[in-house]
From Swiss-Prot:
Residues 1-60 form the 4Fe-4S domain. PROSITE patterns: 4FE4S (PS51656). Keywords: 4Fe-4S, Cobalt, Iron, Iron-sulfur, Metal-binding, Methanogenesis, Methyltransferase, Transferase. Part of a complex that catalyzes the reversible cleavage of acetyl-CoA, allowing growth on acetate as sole source of carbon and energy. It comes from the Archaea. It catalyses: 5,6,7,8-tetrahydrosarcinapterin + methyl-Co(III)-[corrinoid Fe-S protein] = 5-methyltetrahydrosarcinapterin + Co(I)-[corrinoid Fe-S protein] + H(+). Its EC number is 2.1.1.245. This is Acetyl-CoA decarbonylase/synthase complex subunit gamma. It comes from Methanosarcina acetivorans (strain ATCC 35395 / DSM 2834 / JCM 12185 / C2A). The keyword Transferase applies. InterPro entries: 4Fe-4S_dom (IPR007202), Ac-CoA_synth_d_su_TIM-brl (IPR016041), ACDS_complex_subunit (IPR051069), AcylCoA_decarb/synth_gsu (IPR016218), AcylCoA_decarb/synth_gsu_arc (IPR023427), Dihydropteroate_synth-like_sf (IPR011005). The lineage of its organism: Archaea, Methanobacteriati, Methanobacteriota, Stenosarchaea group, Methanomicrobia. It holds the Pfam family CdhD. The keyword Methyltransferase applies. Heterodimer of delta and gamma chains. The ACDS complex is made up of alpha, epsilon, beta, gamma and delta chains with a probable stoichiometry of (alpha(2)epsilon(2))(4)-beta(8)-(gamma(1)delta(1))(8).
Amino acid sequence: MKINSPLEAYKYLPQTNCGECGEATCMAFASKLIDRSGKTSDCPPLIKEKKFAKKLAELDRLLAPEIRQVTIGVGEKAVNIGGDDVLYRHKLTFFNKTKMFFDVADNMDEAALVERVNSIANFRKFYVGRNLLLDGVAIRAVSNDPAKFAAAVKKVAEAGLPMIFCSFNPAVLKAGLEAAKDLKPLLYAANKDNWKEVGELAIEYKVPVVVSAFNDLDALKTLAKTYAEAGIKDIVLDPGTYPTGKGLKDTFTNFLKIRRAGIMGDTEIAYPIMALPFTAWMAGIADPVSASYWETVMASVFTIRYGDIMILHSLEPYATLPEVHLAETIYTDPRTPVSVDGGMYKVGSPTADSPVLFTTNFALTYYTVESDISSNGIDCWLLAVDTDGIGVEAAVAGGQLTADKVKDAFDKAGFDLKTAVNHNTVVTPGLAARLQGDLEDKLGANVKVGPMDSGRIPGWMEKNWPPK
């Protein structure tokens, strides 16, 4: 993105404040364009009226991310990769979390193939208010047989996940594309030997393609430039992923060089980067647990350092959980704390005799408290106070959590302590103990100070509930 101020974007908008974009003013819409929560296509006059055509083209150019965004797949499960504008998250944020595709082989028994694909498609891990998922399937043409590969593609496509077709044989890739028309898979890969044929497939079927040159950035850039000049825009870079030793060091360095060059304005190499942690299984590690461990280490390294998409093998929980957790953490937007909606929540099946607790709406705090309560079978009312997504201790210190705000939260939730429960008592977090007196005055209720750590709530309840 070459502009970073709403005022700069505003110059290219109709400036009529028509409201068709859903915002009251064009300036408000310009702000959405800058923080990438809105798109130029959301402004009907800008799109439909010919007099704005030049402004639209220029605005799209200025708003385009430094690293091209590439879409793989179609529909709700399609994934975007790339699209970043900075080298370091604190300067803005990272967009489009690293996408994790897991491999299958086209020579697998059908039952085993279906079972593995279902394992990928059905993976769910609830984490801080959302389900973490695996992103897609990479189909490796181990057989090098076009017919067998096409059959595997048809079977995998039934899961509805985005796909990567892995073969250096253009005939195999073409068979896969015929079996998955209009599903927009990613082709892996074009190299110095097959670039012409694979490029023709990418143009004919309008699909994204990986260009590959192991540890040769000059060749990689040449391939990408050649494809761009041929009209292929959706390109992914594979500089090679070596699993150990100097090769791994070179891989790490190459990722840094590519991304730095792209962010600094070298458009010929400003594309998403593919990492291949599954090469850990080719490093001669006999023990599958150790191989899986090393694959996870590699995935972690390249999640942190600019891997936009990766192909992995191990589906063991000890491998997938750290991989998806790390990606979720690295791609959390530092500009906006992760939060839940403020309001009153039921934990279990609370009654008029159940305890009433409150915490802040910082997602990690809320879900930790909720989990500690529900996992111990405690039915209660849990109020999330809107503190702009800040945790209890910091919110108390910064004034985002006060007695007035707690009272407002109860009022907005329509929860009257005098009538909704029989005990007229509320439990405050231990880290908010200083609010006890003010809360009693504001709420007209009995306020008990709970434990400092929500993990101690069950023991605290045994000693202090019901109130005497």
